[in-house]
Amino acid sequence: MIAQALISAFEQFLDDPAGVLPEDAINPAPQEFDESDLTDPALGYLSDDALPDPERGCIIGIIDDAIPFAHERLRLCNGASRVAATWIQDARFQPGGTGGDLPSGIELRGADIDVWLARARAGEIPGEDAIYRLSGVLDMARQTTPSTAYAAGHGAAVAMLAAGFSPDDPAGRNHPVIAVNLPPKVTEDSMGTLSPVSILASILFIITRARRLCRFIERRRELPAGSVRLPVVINLSFGLTAGARDGSSLLEQFMDAVSVQGAGDLGPIRFVLPTGNHRLARLHGRLKPGEDLGWRLPPDDRTVTGLEVWGPVRDGLPEDKLQITLTPPGLAGATTAFTAPWQFSLMKDPQGREIARAYYTPRYLGGGSWREGVTIIVMPTCPEHLSEPFAPAGEWRIAIAAHSPDAEYQLGVQRDEVIRGFHREARQSWLFDPQYRLYDEAGRLVETDAQNGGTPNVLRRGTMNAYAGGQYSLRAGAVDQKKMHLAPYCSLLHDEEGGDCLAVVDRAITQPGMLTSGRGSGSFGLMSGTSMAAPQFSRWLAQQLAAGESVADRDAIRSLAESQSDMPA
């Protein structure tokens, strides 16, 4: 399965059907990977004095945005880099450089980074900022968002929480880093339509380079072939708010398969993700046939708005397909008439212009089981140009058609927010049910469905990250430092827990955020969210695996965490 996914993901990434990459980032002729990385010093992963202990090391993989590989907390006291490899997916391709096997961008290995750091120490270049510019990671002349230039970015905070060590801390040497900088368009697209292929390719890069790093250690230490099998922890602080949440997406299935099957010449591979930040955002709901629910679309939204409907698990697809009824404000409703998978329906305004469409997207779960799904895409409520069609803002009504198969159907509104630092005129829509209470009589937030009372069709439970529905990925939630109380924004799993592990993120419920490292050494920022909990969990898990702890599955990791007093939260 890994081999098939490798071919598929890299082919899709090379074809770049979504236009994620600038044209000059594409590698026109990827080369076959050879053994030269074990013999050519210029292709080395780490200097000899930065190699981890083969018996007590654990590789930390990070997939994020604008990871500052030159940061002092990713170096040793002698100045050597702990970053074995980093792939900047959208950088301008450099023929003849490291990473000729990759479909795009550039790869910098430890040997490359050490050269840049040595030049900075010698005064040949001004410092870390110059390293990013001269290496091709940051190019202000290109038509992309220069997120690496931001003083305090998401990737910097995540990377240092997961793998940052003081240069004089000997523990850092046993945690080499393999990182991937996702293209800015992937980070900007909060709906996640562009991310699966990029993330899948990133996972495969980390696994491939982790295997090569182990072979590199064997060669440099003169150890038997196949004897070094370092474990790997991969942190993915990304997520979606709409999806099946049952582990059936390609990305979730792949992470589960890798967690179970691993790689024959590596130790265990574990994935850590945030639980999510949208418990109180009113993006998750339920409906039965014949019921309807409000869906509020704000004005001045120049992006499309998405919502997904998912039915229960069934033994085969029913003859009477799932149908939905959509009613825009001020217009008549329309009901789909799906008869076969992958069909779509269009909704038009009185002038005949398209304002929404619905796709019938059933998903095969294996063993003859299916889940019916419908994805709804509504046009922007504010067009870029006057001649373009647009959807009316206000309260839409969505219903499960009365003749649909009897069951409870799950609704998920897709995230549609402006990511800090990115210019995108998005506005978040939400579900509306009069029974849903934001505050109680005393003005306090209502944080659980039990506190809410009644039977609202907008829910707080089950609001977890839609990437984290697999059986083996680990979900990290956030608590505040003062009371160790689950953060109000922290999403809930299906069992209403805040995650498999909870980490301190906010200083108090009235003081959100924690101090995190910025892009430059010594700089800092203030960040909040479960994206800051996940790297703390990744760091802890990497330390446990390096110490030889056996954690075969999610329950074992939970048990280990609960047995240790030094566990975050």
Language-model features: where?
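Short acidic, glycine-rich surface-loop motifs adjacent to enzyme active sites
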Residues: P22-P28, N181-L182, I203-S248, P274, ...
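Subtilisin-like serine protease catalytic core
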Residues: L46-A201, L317-L322, G469-Y472, K483-H485, ...
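Extracellular S/T/G-rich loop segment that most often corresponds to the catalytic His/Ser-adjacent loop
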Residues: I88-R92, D114, A120-G123, R282-E372, ...
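Active-site core segment of subtilase-fold serine proteases
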Residues: D65-A156, D169-G172, F338-G394, A401-Q435, ...
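Active-site glycine-centered loops adjacent to acidic/histidine catalytic or metal-binding residues
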Residues: D64, G276, G529
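Hydrolase catalytic cores
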Residues: A159-A162, P167, V180-K185, R209-L213, ...
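Mature extracellular/periplasmic domains of secretome proteins
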Residues: F13-P17, S47-C58, R73-N78, R82, ...
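N-terminal domain-start motif of subtilase-like serine proteases
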Residues: I2-I62, A66-G79, V137-A151, P380-P389, ...
